[in-house]
């Protein structure tokens, strides 16, 4: 029977519920259990697809084309289970489903209310995410409830998980509450009162935590744990310190050494082999003992919030581990770059990466970045928009297509080398269409797609005959310009079979040592255990660049 662990948060947001949940999942997985994670988001958006990266951070895309919370990226990097649409849902999706049922008459004329209709729907989504009653059912489903206890938005979710725990029984459910202990410098002590209050709020709802994860800058002293235990009705061994660390990959070991997984297994009556965290220890050792360093410039539009590029940042770090080097990433605002100052801004880096993005702001700076990398033989990786700006730059300055641009930025461009995709096959094989008047939400080319890779290319040396990666974009290289770009020397090394959509562009080895742009998002499939072949090759190219003489 599937067991459930519900992870809630209190006092403030952004405490790291996602990392805590993923770490617990990793420990349980190391005990031989089949684990999945489910993220419950209390906002009314149907999904985060139309939300600003400045507000929400990265949108993580799954193989089945779901646009999800960035925490699902942590989940995939920490455990073996691949995430799907059913692993993330929002208040908006729940209400959408309830209203559709009401319109169909599924509620038989009843007055539709938060309790029981919305809370029942939440429970059904949770059970679906856990695969309950199917061959895909897991041993343990860890459900992270977004938001903060006390917020009005989270109340239906908390009520739903309370009800689900009651139905499943005490030996099939556990509650873990993440809280914050502020350090008052003038008093020289940690304060436990906010934690007492947040647990009190949780107990008023009808939820008694089995474990408290106490976030603080440093380890929580034993006397403070005793005090917290007394006032929250949580046994002392369930009050667990979760302090700041220099790498998130230390968290599984931290939680295990304080007995969190043992507590959960006892509560859920799970008889498992001992925990084996050797590969996590090896991973931490690798991060702490690099044999060198490479400097990479990430030229983007959302650099004020590093979470906007969370998976790219992690993929670069993973690739560094594969080559035993530390990757020092500098986020450079593309609005600050032009042809005139690109050398001053970028010459100190070993490689350049231009990630994805939407809208015209900062695009010319990205085009200047691609030009600098091409002309100065700097290793270049363009992802999604990064591939498109590389194509625009090449069209303008090599192919002689004056005014070349994307119709996203200039609808009246004389040479629209990048244009809106009007028809494509989605991840599940269905043919989708759209035009400039279509809704923004849920109308992109999304999910895993496969393409053949041209032999003898850089892409082929990385991927082999076929590339399968996840997509999230509306615009694509214009098929009408491919022959002109090829004649000018641009290598189009991967195309989709049906629509002939460009997946990868690159420069020949004799022209540039390492220059490639991909329309997809390879960062979503990188893991700390093996990295990702494209990022691994990119970091190796940066290492080679270090050895080469630089232009003054």
Curated annotation (Swiss-Prot):
Q: Does the keyword Metal-binding apply?
A: yes
Name the SUPFAM superfamilies for this protein: Class I glutamine amidotransferase-like, P-loop containing nucleoside triphosphate hydrolases
Superkingdom field? Bacteria
**EC identifiers of the protein:** 6.3.4.2
- Which cysteines in this chain are paired by disulphide bridges? none
Residues engaged in binding CTP: 13, 151-153, 191-196, 227
Pathway this chain belongs to: Pyrimidine metabolism; CTP biosynthesis via de novo pathway; CTP from UDP: step 2/2
Domain Glutamine amidotransferase type-1: residue ranges: 295-548
GO MF assignments: ATP binding; CTP synthase activity; glutaminase activity; identical protein binding; metal ion binding
User: How would you summarize its activity regulation?
Assistant: Allosterically activated by GTP, when glutamine is the substrate; GTP has no effect on the reaction when ammonia is the substrate. The allosteric effector GTP functions by stabilizing the protein conformation that binds the tetrahedral intermediate(s) formed during glutamine hydrolysis. Inhibited by the product CTP, via allosteric rather than competitive inhibition.
Q: Where does Mg(2+) bind?
A: 71, 144
Q: Where does UTP bind?
A: 13, 191-196, 227
Q: Which residues form the active site?
A: 384 (nucleophile), 521, 523
Q: Which stretches of sequence are listed as region Amidoligase domain?
A: 1-270
Q: Which UniProt keywords apply?
A: ATP-binding, Glutamine amidotransferase, Ligase, Magnesium, Metal-binding, Nucleotide-binding, Pyrimidine biosynthesis
Binding positions for ATP per the UniProt entry: 14-19, 71
| The keyword Cell membrane is assigned to this record | no
Q: What GO terms in the biological process aspect are recorded for it?
A: 'de novo' CTP biosynthetic process; pyrimidine nucleobase biosynthetic process
- Please tell me one Gene Ontology term that the record gives under cellular component: cytosol
Known catalytic reactions: UTP + L-glutamine + ATP + H2O = CTP + L-glutamate + ADP + phosphate + 2 H(+); L-glutamine + H2O = L-glutamate + NH4(+); UTP + NH4(+) + ATP = CTP + ADP + phosphate + 2 H(+)
Q: Which family does the similarity line name?
A: Belongs to the CTP synthase family.
Q: What subunit structure does UniProt give?
A: Homotetramer.
Looking up HAMAP family in the UniProt record yields: PyrG
Q: Which NCBIfam families match?
A: PRK05380.1, PyrG
What name does this protein carry? CTP synthase
**Annotated organism of origin:** Delftia acidovorans (strain DSM 14801 / SPH-1)
Source organism lineage? Bacteria, Pseudomonadati, Pseudomonadota, Betaproteobacteria, Burkholderiales
